[in-house]
Design a protein with these regions (language model features):
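NAD(P)-dependent Rossmann-like dehydrogenase/reductase catalytic/cofactor-binding core
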Residues: 227, 235-351
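Internal alpha-helical scaffold of NAD(P)-dependent oxidoreductase catalytic cores
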Residues: 93, 134-207, 219-257
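Nucleotide donor/acceptor-binding cores
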Residues: 2, 72, 165
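Rossmann-like NAD(P)(H) cofactor-binding subdomain of soluble oxidoreductases
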Residues: 54-154
Length: 351
């Protein structure tokens, strides 16, 4: 039985850890603060949509990565903007064959790794500033994933599961390896639906179309998904912004099996749901703006596709984050400037 470490026991990390532990698998939870104290004392309480609760006890809950030691799989359950600071600390969890599964929204730092084409090996500065992530997590360790769970961390050690049990996996090079199949079996035993794709990047873009439009628009307007879609001008903005992103993706060889309208209709079923970005802004937390929006704008420049709507949403959301996150001096990855600041600095340098 493989040992799986979940780094970050927030809503998604906590949900995955609970499901794996409840299915009898060896799970280590890497957490900190009040959340760690609660998990050590009472395990993870999983609140289900029918009102029932389950309590999961992981094999180990700790903030000491050296004490946890090497694992077969490390799932990164933190937000994307936390990974640049986290990556240099992961060494104690990584053995020679350890796989790393980043469970973040947006374009992942490894997107142009282990692939062919004119952009193979390209690094996205917006999400991997200075190469800090890729220099500490070797490309061959990565298994790509796309998560579809909606959950909330209601209190330390308490996760409310809302919906969604799909957790798509795929090697960046498209090979269905023994390790990705083994992880899929483990997650399937935990009650998740786990397709293994030979082209994980297409599924990344399908989900991203929603995240990079609905999330910033909802945060800027303080509106739910239903309100964004129900108001004709913002619905039109969503569709036009999705079209920009689709053009960017098409330059990378991505094709979409569903139309923009179907994608919008699917989101409409979420009704009064608040996007995670809106929740972050309301709580004064940093958002995933670089991963959801900034990276798309950066890829647009790389493939020479104009993205005026994406650029506008990005500029507005980065400013909103800057003014909403109390005591925060930056609004991108730790220790870095946002892509907006970098672009304007370059323009000033050449003025």
């Amino acid at each position: 039985m493989m040992r799986i470490a979940i780094v970050g026991a927030g809503s998604i990390g906590g949900y995955l850890a609970a499901r794996l532990a409840l299915s009898g698998q060896r799970v280590t939870v890497i957490a900190r603060g009040a959340n760690l104290s609660a998990i050590r004392a009472n395990g993870i309480t999983l609140r289900l949509p029918d009102g029932t609760e389950e309590r999961a006890i992981p094999e180990l809950a700790t903030d000491d990565l050296a004490a946890a030691g090497p694992h077969d799989v490390v799932i990164l359950g933190v937000k994307g903007q936390q990974i640049p600071a986290l990556a240099p600390t992961l060494g104690p969890l990584l053995g020679p064959e350890t796989a790393v599964v980043p469970a973040q929204n947006g374009i992942p730092w490894w997107y142009f790794q282990r692939c062919d084409g004119p952009y193979a090996g390209h690094r996205l500065e917006s999400i991997d500033p200075g190469g800090v992530i890729s220099s500490h997590i070797a490309p061959e360790r990565v298994i790509g994933c796309v998560t579809y769970q909606a959950a909330e961390l209601e209190a330390p050690g308490v996760v409310r599961f809302i919906e969604g049990n799909r957790f798509t996996l795929g090697e960046p090079d498209g090979v269905k390896t023994d390790r990705v199949r083994a992880l899929a079996r483990a997650l399937t035993r935990a009650g998740l639906k786990v397709p293994v794709r030979s082209d994980i990047r297409t599924e990344i873009w399908v989900k991203l179309l929603g995240n990079m439009t609905f999330n910033p628009i909802s945060a800027l307007t303080r509106a739910t998904l239903g309100e964004v879609i129900g108001y004709a001008p913002t619905r039109e903005l969503v569709a036009a912004t999705m079209a920009e992103a689709q053009e960017v993706a098409s330059r990378l060889g991505i094709t979409f099996a569903i139309t923009t309208e179907r994608r919008i209709q699917g989101a409409a079923q979420m009704g009064s749901h608040k996007t995670s970005t809106l929740q972050d802004i309301e709580a004064g937390r940093p958002t995933e703006v670089e991963w959801l929006v900034g990276a798309v704008a950066e890829v647009g420049r790389l493939v020479e596709v104009p993205t005026p709507r994406i650029d506008a949403l990005y500029a507005c959301l980065t400013l909103l984050e800057r003014t909403s996150c109390s005591g925060r001096t930056d609004h991108g990855s730790p220790g870095t400037k946002s892509m907006v600041d970098q672009i304007y600095e370059k323009e000033r340098d050449h003025a």
